[in-house]
Structures are given as C-alpha cells and as structure tokens.
Design a protein with these regions (language model features):
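Active-site-adjacent structural elements that line small-molecule/cofactor binding pockets in enzymes
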Residues: 1-332
Length: 332
C-alpha cells in the first residue's frame, strides 16, 4: 500500500503550527512528511518561510515513525553541495531509517536571494548533477575532493558524522531527461501532480534509466506531491485556492519568477477555471479519495497531499478517518 504523507508547507504556516499538524497527522494515519524548502513564500498572503533544516530536526525529535525529507532542496545556489551532504548526513544519523534527501535544480524565487546570474534550465540540471556527485562522494565517509568541477570546488575533506546507511537521494523533476537521469544515478523520483499521461511518461523514463544502470525500478521509491483544496463547501474550497494558493492555477513554468510580489501580480489574473485539471477543488471526500487512488494505481509509492486552505486540523482528521483507510493497494 502506498504511503500517504502530509505535505508541510513551510511557506504558508508558522513552523510551530506545522509541527503540531504533523504530530496530528501521524496520529491520524499519515505515514510521511514532505517539507517545503523555501526562502520566500509564493505570494505574500502565504506569510511564512521558515528554514526547513532547523524544522526537520524538530520534526524528527517530536514524531515517532514518520518518514520525511525536504521537497526539495537545491544544492546549487543557496547551499554548497558539501553543506547539503553534511546536513543530510546529520539528520539521517539522528533519525536513522526515517530521512530521505529530496533534491532539485531550483527556482529563482528561492535561489536568486544570493545574487548572480540565473542560469537556463539545462545549466541548472548540469549543476544539480555535479552537486549530486559531490554529495554521493561525501556519503561514502571517505576523504573526497572536487577540484576539477565546472560549477563547484571542494577541498580534500570528509564527513565526520555519518548515519548507519546514507540517506536515499530522490530527484524532483517534471521532465523526461531529468527523470531518466534520476533513475540511472539516484534512488528515487519526486514529481508534482499532473495528467496521468504525463506522469506515466515520467515514470517510464525513470524506469528506463534505472534499468540502464542495472537497478530494479520496482524497488525504487516514486513520490508524488499533490496540491488540493478541501473544505465543507465548494465555495470555501475555491476561495481557499484563489487566496492561499493562486500559484496552483498558473498554467506556465514558475522557475524564473523572482519575488512573492511578482507572483501576486500574476495571481490577480487567476480565475476558478484555471485550476481545472491542475488541482482538485471539492468538498466531497470520496472525490478526493478517488483522485488519490488513480495515482496509487499508477504506481506511486508515496503521495504527499497538501490541502491549500488554513483548515489543516479539519483536513487531517477528515482525510485520516474517511480517505486514507478507504484507499486500496495498487491494482497494477
């Protein structure tokens, strides 16, 4: 049976509130947490952006069984890959068997805060690939150096605090090239909700890459992040989407937009019809169950759900009681 996880939107809630929500989620049948790594919220209305690595340490210490990781960290701009490796190894040492490392190529909203030129997508992918190579070297526990890199330098060094086994590395992508590389070189894939046809294609590319590397893709985690809006009425659910998560209705890539204020200006153009086929908005819990079930049937091992409204306690209890128990194991 797929893990149903709670997507912790650190760009939307105070970190202490999110800890309480995750503890509540653990008591109501959620099995994992995917934590957003943001420097800024998407739009000012969301109101927060706590440091995910501090927060995950608290999450690990105040929950018992939840698996968790950042969804996702970019190891290329705000962080040097060696620092990401150290942070991940420390977290995995403190919560062995529970932590995974989610990595991606970054968004200007969060990474441009350190200045510099914002590269084209193919350059960001190359940077991610080089960064992953450094992280994997350090996870071995051996002395490593990286003095011939195109984008990064690292002196002769090793990690001194290591977990019993290295945390698995999952790569976030919505494109086929990165999906295939993730299958070859990493341990799992993370992707946002999309059409079944697109997701089927991405999983196929991921599996193709895994087979090229002699790995069994059936044993490699496939994670989905799913935004939705549930409330007691359709009108309330729609208003939550428009107010709290208008970025979910923007029909274009968002990696190059640089500030919450820029997003807010674009959000003024978002209308209810823009959410169609992008995010389920419904008061019907069985409709949400059926929506999640189709992704379980497609082959995802973990589905991390984010209800975009402020009604988090009601959402967690309702889904824990009436949605999660009624999901079936994959029929594929």
């Amino acid at each position: 049976m797929a893990i149903i996880g709670y997507a912790a939107a650190l760009e939307q809630f105070h970190p202490n509130d999110l800890l309480a929500y995750c503890q509540l989620a653990e008591r109501h049948g959620f099995k994992g947490v995917m934590a957003a790594d943001h420097f800024q919220p998407w739009v000012p209305q969301q109101g927060h952006s706590a440091f995910v690595w501090s927060w995950m340490a608290a999450l690990g210490a105040t929950t018992c069984t939840l698996t968790f990781g950042p969804g996702v960290t970019c190891p290329s701009f705000r962080y040097h890959p060696a620092i990401v490796a150290q942070a991940a190894a420390t977290q995995a040492a403190m919560t062995p068997g529970r932590f995974w490392l989610g990595l991606g190529s970054g968004e200007a909203l969060n990474e441009r805060v350190v200045g510099g030129v914002w590269p084209e997508p193919h350059i960001r992918l190359q940077m991610l690939q080089e960064a992953v190579g450094i992280i994997k070297k350090l996870f071995t526990g051996k002395v490593a150096r990286h003095d011939d890199g195109r984008y990064f330098k690292m002196e002769r060094v090793r990690l001194w605090t290591l977990p019993p086994t290295p945390p698995p590395i999952y790569i976030a992508t919505a494109g086929p090239v990165t999906a295939e590389w993730a299958g070859r070189e990493c341990d799992g894939i993370i992707t946002p909700g999309a059409s079944l046809d697109k997701l089927r294609m991405l999983l196929g590319k991921f599996e193709e890459g895994a087979r090229k590397a002699g790995k069994d893709p059936a044993r490699m985690p496939k994670l989905l992040q799913l935004h939705m809006s549930w409330a007691e009425t359709y009108e309330e659910a729609m208003q939550n989407a428009l107010t709290e998560w208008p970025n979910g209705g923007m029909p274009f890539p968002k990696q190059d937009i640089r500030s919450p204020e820029d997003f807010a200006e674009i959000a003024r153009l978002v209308r209810p019809e823009n959410f169609k086929n992008r995010m389920l908005i419904s008061p019907d819990l069985d409709e949400h169950r059926a929506y999640i079930q189709q992704f379980v049937d497609l082959g995802f091992d973990e589905i991390h759900v984010h209800n975009v409204g402020r009604n988090q306690e009601q959402f967690i209890k309702a889904f824990g009681e009436q949605v999660i128990p009624r999901l079936n194991a994959s029929s594929t």
